[in-house]
Regions:
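Aromatic/His-enriched, Gly/Pro-containing loop or helix-boundary segments
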Residues: 141-165
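Short, Lys/Arg-enriched N-terminal segments with co-localized hydrophobic residues
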Residues: 26, 30-46
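Short hydrophobic alpha-helical segments enriched in small aliphatic residues
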Residues: 4, 20-23, 30
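Short hydrophobic targeting helices and cationic amphipathic motifs
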Residues: 18-20, 294
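Catalytic or ion-coupling anion/metal-binding cores of large enzyme and transporter domains
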Residues: 48-96, 100-102, 107-126, 133-134, ...
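A short, small-residue-rich loop immediately preceding and capping a beta-strand
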Residues: 158-180, 191-195
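Short, charge-rich patches within N-terminal targeting peptides
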Residues: 8-14
């Protein structure tokens, strides 16, 4: 629904109605039904009269003393009816830093349309994000982890400062996903999370490739195994569309978490960013948040100890990012839940690894979506006894109720049954010992060698380690240790993807260890 520009105050606003895009194709692939209802049905909310006397926005819109505030709203073309409705903050992490975020603005407009259609007044704003793919391998990466806190803080301040009643958060790149979910839990206003979608895979020499292949190609190039022309050809085709990194890196890991934990609509995390069906999910999210206001369902009603355990289970089952072990305790902290690193690791230890996703496996997010998506993954884990089905979600129903009509698709190769997992324990594990008394996290998805002993080779920053790797100044059997790169020491806890990928690119991934 597209609303024309408002006329002068008091005049009736002209409205033009357009049919929503046909999204049926996004729910069926061949004979496999991925969802039992279109997304607009999932988020449907009856037209509701809201009592603003109990909502935060009453402080900026109700009573004669708020006439100056209302004059600002009239200046933006708002009508008396819109001022009298609940105010919903629609926040996106849109920017032009990287493809991860450029589809968010489009989806935010659809979310606003959903809010409007369900008797709400959307108020759009943006916050920052730092894109790891651009920040990686240099001083810029020190900005990444702290950006999570800045995102949460900035959203909190904007929501509180303007007395918004509810929130829809749209995120694309790594730290922005937990940042927005942390803000939702801190504010505890009715909220729906919306992932912006993953990138399409590129194609190089007849094979699907992602940006990780380019990182690894840097190592191959340094070793003299890839000429300049081939490296350039790969970099030009690896990232063909908008969207976040296609493998099960931080963005897709936390997108899966958003569904597992109950803050996102079912199946909304799966469709790639270019798909028009994302707009339908965004519109449904707008309607869903109005339903949450009407029923006073808040993030801390949804995110409980049980739902946090569900989230950790999904991280392990998908061979997800080790960052999940950082973000889940931070989210739990915002909700007042005790859920630390080693408690997360205990769940990792008893969860089967069943999703064959890059970087440890073969497939990307688009493939899992077409195979059955996050709902099929969740149903598989639920039936295996690995999830709590009684957790509330943003649909107003429990996780088990959302999954009632989902069945396992045997004609796909991405998601394995729990009775025949890729490995019996999770793709991410926690360790504790003399080397790391407070605990450590290791991504073991795709690794064959789980024990290593060697000579320590110490570096005091990432740049020194990468330079040594680039000139192959190390040998098989070394344990490469990069010191002073923690949250305080760095500061910022930079991720060592450039160094890790270069080692793999040189063919030495199983010959050295990296700490």
């Amino acid at each position: 629904r597209v609303h024309g520009a408002a006329n002068k105050a008091g005049q009736k606003k002209q409205k033009m109605d357009f049919h929503s895009p046909d999204v049926a194709d996004s729910f069926s692939h061949g004979s496999i039904i991925l969802a039992t209802k279109p997304p607009e049905a999932i988020g449907r909310c009856a037209m509701t009269e809201f009592d603003k006397s109990k909502l935060p926005s009453r402080h900026v819109s109700v009573g004669p003393e708020r006439a100056p505030h209302r004059s600002y709203y009239y200046a933006m073309g708002m009508t008396e009816e819109e001022i009298a409705q609940p105010f919903v903050g629609v926040v996106s992490c849109w920017n032009e830093a990287a493809p991860c975020n450029i589809a968010l603005m489009r989806q935010a407009q659809a979310a606003k349309a959903g809010v409007k259609s369900a008797s709400g007044t959307p108020r759009e704003f943006c916050t920052i994000t730092v894109t790891d793919g651009i920040a990686m391998g240099h001083e810029g990466m020190k900005s990444s982890l702290i950006s999570r806190e800045v995102i949460a803080d900035s959203v909190e301040l904007t929501m509180r400062g303007h007395c918004y009643d509810a929130m829809i958060g749209l995120a694309g790149c790594d730290k922005s996903l937990p940042g927005l979910m942390m803000a939702m839990l801190r504010l505890n206003v009715p909220s729906v999370f919306m992932y912006g979608g993953s990138i399409m895979p590129g194609e190089f020499k007849g094979k699907d490739v992602t940006v990780l292949d380019v990182f690894e190609a840097v190592g191959q190039h340094a070793a003299g195994n890839m000429p300049d022309e081939e490296l350039h050809e790969l970099e030009c085709v690896a990232c063909p569309s908008a969207g976040a990194c296609g493998g099960q890196f931080t963005a897709n890991t936390m997108a899966c978490v958003s569904e597992a934990i109950g803050l996102a609509l079912p199946n909304s995390a799966g469709a790639p960013a270019p798909y028009e069906s994302r707009d339908a999910y965004a519109e449904a999210s707008g309607k869903a948040v109005m339903n949450l206001i009407a029923n006073n369902i808040r993030p801390r009603d949804i995110v409980t100890r049980k739902s946090m355990e569900n989230a950790a289970t999904v991280v392990a089952a998908t061979g997800g990012s080790t960052n999940g072990a950082l973000h889940l305790p931070a989210m739990a902290h915002e909700a007042g839940i005790d859920f630390d690193l080693m408690q997360v690791a205990e769940i990792f230890k008893k969860t089967p690894y069943i999703a064959d996703l890059k970087p440890g496996g073969q497939y990307v997010a688009k493939d899992m979506y077409e195979a059955g998506g996050v709902p099929m993954l969740l149903k598989t884990l639920l039936e295996g006894g690995y999830l709590h089905g009684d957790c509330l979600t943003v649909t107003g129903k429990t996780l088990a109720e959302n999954l009632e009509e989902i069945t396992f698709n045997p004609d796909q190769k991405v998601i394995y049954p729990v009775s025949n997992p890729i490995t019996p324990t999770g793709g991410v594990v926690g360790l504790k010992g003399s080397l790391a008394p407070d605990g450590a996290i290791v991504k073991v998805a795709g690794m064959e060698k789980l024990q290593f002993e060697g000579t320590a080779r110490c570096f005091d920053c990432e740049e020194d380690a990468f330079a040594a790797v680039e000139r192959e100044d190390y040998k098989a059997g070394d344990v490469i240790i990069i010191r002073y790169e923690g949250p305080k020491g760095g500061p910022g806890m930079r991720e060592m993807l450039s160094t890790t990928s270069a080692i793999y690119g040189q063919g030495n991934g199983d010959k050295v260890a990296l700490i």
